[in-house]
Amino acid sequence: LAAPTASVALQDAPVVYAGLWRRVAASILDSLITTVAVYLIVIPLVFVVALVTTRGDWGSALDAGSALGIAILVMSCGIVLAIPTLYFAWMQSSRHQASLGKLACGIKLVRADSHGGRVGFWRNVLRYLAYKLISVLTLGIGVIVAAFMAGMTERKQAPHDKVCDTLVVDRWAFTEYPERQSRGLDTVSIVVLAIYAVIQVLSVVAVAFMLAAIGMSRS
């Protein structure tokens, strides 16, 4: 549930900004949610292409399949961008002011200049697109810069936060209960980060074993 809003006087209480690791944990959860949503849409499209290309005359089917395949590829790229954009814009402009990942990790998104006010739908769209654009134009370096700024700057603002004048804060910031804010990692964030770390380690070990097995089979 969304934390209650506060009177103007209480909104002037100290604010706890969400640090790097809480944001990373929330991002992991949100990535899982949006990835599943994308697959649920894209996979049926792939089956449609396969169905079309295996019907009728092989020559015309291949031609139609090639054209449709290109169309599906373009549509898939659009879906991969549109799903998370709409997801974040809808959730973070709602009364919760947070995506599902942020809700789970006890943080929310607010306007930097409005004492905890909501970030509008289109500003959320711009914020996500700014994040993706910065990441693409810098060949991924923007992600590292965003992580550094989210962890080290005074108000924990990443570049896309500065562009859109937003803050990521504890869910109890700018409410009637500012004393409930937490500066450390919450339980959900710790569990998510721990599981993610274990998965990464196991992935590295699995790849190492596969490479070793391939090397042994060739020798």
Show where each model-derived region lies:
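Membrane-helix interface segments in multi-pass membrane proteins
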Residues: 38-81, 189-219
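A structural micro-motif at secondary-structure boundaries
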Residues: 111-124
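Juxtamembrane cytosolic face of transmembrane helices
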Residues: 14-25, 31, 87-103, 118, ...
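Short, charged N-terminal extramembrane segments
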Residues: 8, 108-109, 167-170
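Cytosolic-side membrane-entry/anchor segment at the start of a transmembrane helix
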Residues: 14-53, 77-97, 212-216
